[in-house]
Curated annotation (Swiss-Prot):
PROSITE patterns: KRAB, ZINC_FINGER_C2H2_1, ZINC_FINGER_C2H2_2. It comes from Homo sapiens. This is Zinc finger protein 417. GO terms for cellular component: nucleus. InterPro entries: KRAB, KRAB_dom_sf, Znf_C2H2-type, Znf_C2H2_sf, Znf_C2H2_type. Belongs to the krueppel C2H2-type zinc-finger protein family.
Length: 575
């Protein structure tokens, strides 16, 4: 086989590494034996060491200074035989530290330690690290990069079948671009996962083998048909989403490990429920469900969690942080899963159809949860009272009734709620928003439930009856509070004055007497009130609304109490 002839020096007295490099074609490389390939590497190393010791530049003429450059070549721990015409025994002083070495190869190895100190220095904080892999991990702390390729191994990747010098090879660039600079080594090969045999014995760079690259640059494929299904694993924010449970992952390896928990019976079995896992760490996290062990407590409310990620998501309830933003509509979310659900609503595609009722769903785990409505399955059980639920979220909300946790606090008045939806509805009291409209009379409400209760006024429906006196009510909660009149029960007591009340809402309003708080402000005149009902009555002064009409004479009034007083005058006249 004929190897390509080395190029001649372009200038008198100037020798570059490419001038003495020997390049093989793809076909020629395949014909080399293992011993010949090892010899090829040794020769290239000797040439590099010789040129470095002479202070020559190892790059092309257009490239920049050699002090920050190095070549990445995989070497085995074997003896290197000096070539003819090369005298390794010579005094070689190191310009960096002053150390003098006689052997040219030892001198080359010594100089490489200085290069590594520069190459493995963090550009953000100047910290030196021992290894390039540690630099990769350290750099992620500065740039927050979650998606990164596999660390470049100590192997020889050569672009376009040439030994190339890499300049600053371990400086991270903007996400989505090459990890290595344009004049460096393995710009395209860095994204390809190579086996040990390919790295040791394969050609320096196999062109045409991985022409199709995933947009995230985490995986490369040999055919276009292979990359398309891989790309479907991503959402718009670049995460891997599990189609079985909706959980999202920033790294493909974490996503792949998680999927094994759904698809395969792992070697780690739970002794309590028999569930199996492919990883021991997953089993340990699962066992905390049975033991109740929670290793991560919230400093704000004291609630504990079995996983650190769950604690981080929970803390956003207190801080109000919503880091996940939809790029199309600008809507923000506190949890990544909520953003994913929202984004899937853009296309409107509902791939999962219920055979029982015909309802469709965008996500598989939502479809699975829905099917439990028909099957009656309730796999999530409360450890306090034994009540079971079909969805985990319903169990979490139910457990707040036992713990008394109210994580959602109104910044206007300080009132806390168990559910975010209740906080949203409450905040409409301060903003004046009333999105629910009665079709009969046009009256507006800030809660859908209040609209449903109000509509019973028009229909005359009163489905809830008092067991003692038979009085009918349109609201179940009103029946519960009313029955306390018969029993004399007043379970809500004020800590300040000891006064007790029938309902928690009445106690909450009463506490404002002691605090002096008046959260309900009139937008017309600025007057404030302690109760929402007082503000509603006051607004009628500005609007002129008189909703209470006398059936006898047709006279209208702003307040029901005034109407009752007026009706008594008709009764007196009748007597």
């Amino acid at each position: 086989m004929a190897a390509a002839a080395p190029r001649r020096p372009t200038q008198q007295g100037t020798v570059t590494f490419e001038d003495v490099a020997v390049n093989f074609s793809q076909e020629e490389w395949c014909l080399l034996s293992e011993a010949q390939r090892c010899l090829y590497r040794d020769v290239m190393l000797e040439n590099l060491a010789l040129i470095s010791s002479l202070g020559c530049w190892c790059g092309s003429k257009d490239e920049e200074a050699p002090c920050k450059q190095r070549i990445s070549v995989q070497r085995e721990s074997q003896s290197r035989t000096p070539r003819a015409g090369v005298s390794p025994k010579k005094a070689h002083p190191c310009e960096m530290c002053g150390l003098i070495l006689e052997d040219v190869f030892h001198f080359a190895d010594h100089q490489e330690t200085h290069h590594k100190q520069k190459l493995n220095r963090s550009g953000a904080c100047g910290k030196n690290l021992d290894d390039t892999a540690y630099l990769h991990q350290h750099q992620k702390q500065h740039i927050g990069e979650k998606f990164y390729r596999k660390s470049v191994r100590e192997a020889s990747f050569v672009k376009k079948r040439k030994l190339r010098v890499s300049q600053e090879p371990f400086v991270f660039r903007e996400f989505g671009k090459d990890v290595l600079p344009s004049s460096g080594l393995c710009q395209e090969a860095a994204a390809v996962e190579k086996t040990d045999s390919e790295t040791m014995h394969g050609p320096p760079f196999q062109e045409g083998k991985t022409n199709y690259s995933c947009g995230k640059r985490t995986k490369a494929f040999s055919t276009k048909h292979s990359v398309i299904p891989h790309q479907k694993l991503f959402t718009r924010d670049g995460c891997y989403v599990c189609s079985d449970c909706g959980k999202s992952f920033s790294r493909y390896v974490s996503f792949s490990n998680h999927q094994r928990d759904h698809t395969a019976k792992g070697p780690y079995d739970c002794g309590e429920c028999g569930k199996s896992y492919s990883r021991k760490s997953s089993l340990i996290q699962h066992q905390r469900v049975h033991t109740g062990k929670t290793a991560y407590p919230c400093e704000e409310c004291g609630k504990s969690f079995s996983q650190k990620g769950s604690l981080i998501s929970h803390q956003r309830v207190h801080t109000g942080e919503r880091p996940y933003e939809c790029r199309e509509y600008g809507k923000s979310f506190g949890q990544k899963g909520n953003l994913i659900q929202h984004q899937q609503g853009h296309t409107g595609e509902r791939a999962y159809h219920c055979g029982e009722c015909g309802k469709s769903f965008r996500q598989k785990f939502c479809f699975i949860n829905h099917q439990r409505v028909h099957t009656g399955e309730r796999p999530y059980k409360c450890g306090e009272c034994g009540k079971s639920f079909g969805q985990k979220g319903n169990l979490v909300q139910h457990q707040r009734g036992h713990t008394g946790e109210r994580p959602y606090e109104c910044k206007e008045c300080g009132k806390s709620f168990r559910y975010r939806s209740h906080l949203t509805e409450h905040q409409r009291l301060h903003t004046g928003e009333r999105p629910y409209n009665c079709r009969e009379c046009g009256k507006l409400f800030n809660r859908k439930y209040h609209l449903l209760v109000h509509e019973r006024v028009h229909t005359g429906e009163r489905p809830y009856a008092c067991e003692v006196c038979g009085k009918l009510f349109g609201n179940k909660n009103c029946v519960t509070i009313h029955q306390r009149i018969h029993t004399g029960e007043r379970p809500y007591e004020c800590n300040e004055c000891g006064k007790s009340f029938l309902s928690s809402s009445a106690l909450h309003v009463h506490k404002r007497v002691h605090s002096g708080q008046k959260p309900y402000k009139c937008s017309e005149c600025g007057k404030s009130f302690a109760e929402c009902s007082s503000l509603i009555k006051h607004r009628r002064i500005h609007t002129g609304e008189r909703p209470y009409e006398c059936t006898k004479c047709g006279k209208t009034f702003q307040r029901s109490s005034t109407l009752l007083h007026h009706q008594s005058s008709h009764r007196r006249k009748a007597l």
